[in-house]
């Protein structure tokens, strides 16, 4: 296995010339073999015959071993990368051996790393888009590309896709404080990287993902408020967590945000009085529980009353800007993540961004950010899409399958009641 060991790849161009000479020579030897019996004795003929047979078998095995069909994973990757170099003309043709782009690859922590070294040759314009070509050739998801070193590009591929979480009661019992597991590899450290935007059209799985986040927060002794202007799925939770925690009108949502703002003031006073309002300290140092507001399609109420709408935007901006230290967090859900729905100044302060279901490119950019020219190859269907989490060192979003509620595995409303 080639884990953590770098394997070098170059395209020498010997396929077209030297290999042709080699196999032509084998054919000549075979032709001579047919004529030899009349000129040499039987014993010598047998030795020559077996020599040519063995050389032929070794050649056939070598061709197979170094091909894309090889039983060796390392050789399969190597052959495919040579094909990428050849097909994209990332070499300078020489008389015998071409001067090509050099690649190195290795596996580290379930990911395949491929490094491309241009070595002064003008491949840079091609290298920026080469990751998508390699992604297609290897049939692996490109999850990151980096140009943080002057002499190389690094492409990171997901070798083994993360396992989806299937929601069960035991899952919430094992949750770490301040952290919510999202799949077998990803988690959201909301205490350090606060607030979330969840975007997705009807049927994309957005609501169930929000249910999962609400359950996760409740299992960590959080206070959760819900604003649902459409009075749909989330609104029904008022019968479980209490009517005073669920609002649907413009004034009701403004009221929740006022409570969140006032909670920040209260916590600031507590932390100041107890000497905890120091650099690097937050709500956890005084054993305060998270205080969360979940708002689904908050833009719906903004047209009802412009004065209240302005108050909502002002309070929302204040809570998102200052809430992290005080343990006050916001989750925004929407079908249309445009600037009218969620102002850019607010979106830029959100750490967790998730798109679920089929979304057009513009919607993906508004949700995930404008800094990404490419997205990894991934399915956009119910409960599946893309995710970006601040603080993880990612340079691009990654594919994501949201936690799944299996039929009859967990009663959602009973679970909310249990953890409330």
Describe each model-derived feature in a short phrase.
Residues 223-225, 230, 237-292:
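Mechanochemical coupling/switch segment within NTP-driven translocation systems
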Residues 2-15, 37-44, 262-420:
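P-loop NTPase motor-domain active sites and their immediate coupling elements
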Residues 236-240, 345-348:
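Short, conserved catalytic or adaptor-binding loops enriched in Gly and charged residues
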Residues 196, 225-227, 352-354:
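Hydrophobic/aromatic beta-strand patches that form the interior of the parallel beta-sheet core
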Residues 1-222, 248, 266-270, 291-294, ...:
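Accessory regions of macromolecular translocation/handling assemblies
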Residues 233-237, 301-304:
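Short acidic/His/Gly/Ser-rich catalytic and metal-binding motifs that mark active-site loops
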């Amino acid at each position: 296995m080639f884990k953590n060991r770098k394997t070098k790849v170059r395209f020498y161009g010997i396929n077209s010339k030297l290999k042709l000479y080699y196999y032509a020579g084998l054919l000549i030897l075979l032709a001579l073999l047919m004529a030899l019996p009349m000129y040499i004795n039987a014993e010598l003929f047998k030795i020559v015959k077996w020599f040519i047979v063995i050389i032929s078998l070794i050649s056939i095995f070598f061709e197979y071993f170094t091909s894309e069909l090889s039983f060796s994973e390392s050789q399969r990757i190597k052959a495919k990368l040579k094909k990428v170099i050849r097909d994209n003309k990332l070499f300078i043709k020489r008389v015998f051996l071409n001067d090509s782009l050099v690649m190195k690859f290795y596996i580290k922590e379930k990911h395949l790393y491929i490094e491309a070294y241009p070595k002064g040759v003008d491949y840079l314009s091609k290298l920026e888009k080469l990751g998508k070509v390699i992604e297609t050739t290897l049939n692996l998801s490109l999850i990151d590309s980096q140009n943080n070193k002057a002499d190389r590009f690094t492409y990171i591929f997901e070798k083994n896709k993360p396992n989806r979480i299937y929601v069960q009661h035991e899952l919430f019992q094992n949750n770490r404080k301040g952290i919510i597991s999202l799949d077998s590899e990803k988690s959201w450290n909301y205490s350090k990287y606060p607030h979330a935007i969840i975007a997705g059209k009807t049927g994309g799985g957005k609501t169930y993902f929000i249910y999962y986040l609400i359950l996760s927060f409740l299992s960590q002794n959080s206070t959760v408020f819900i604003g649902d202007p459409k009075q749909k799925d989330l609104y029904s939770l008022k019968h479980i967590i209490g009517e005073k925690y669920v609002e649907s009108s413009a004034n009701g949502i403004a009221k929740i945000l006022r409570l969140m703002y006032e909670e920040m003031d209260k916590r600031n006073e507590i932390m100041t009085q107890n000497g905890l309002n120091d650099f690097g300290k937050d709500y956890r140092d005084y054993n305060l529980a998270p205080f969360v507001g979940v708002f689904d399609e908050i833009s719906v109420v903004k047209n009802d009353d412009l004065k209240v709408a302005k108050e909502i935007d002002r309070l929302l901006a204040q809570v998102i800007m200052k809430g992290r230290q005080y343990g006050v967090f916001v989750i925004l859900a929407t079908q249309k993540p445009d600037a009218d729905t969620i102002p850019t100044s607010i979106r830029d302060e959100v750490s967790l961004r998730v798109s679920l279901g089929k979304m057009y490119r513009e919607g993906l950019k508004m949700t995930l950010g404008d800094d990404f020219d490419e997205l990894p190859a991934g399915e956009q269907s119910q409960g599946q899409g893309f995710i970006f989490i601040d603080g993880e060192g990612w340079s691009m979003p990654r594919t994501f399958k949201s936690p799944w509620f299996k039929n009859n595995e967990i009663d959602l409303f009973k679970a909310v009641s249990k953890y409330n």
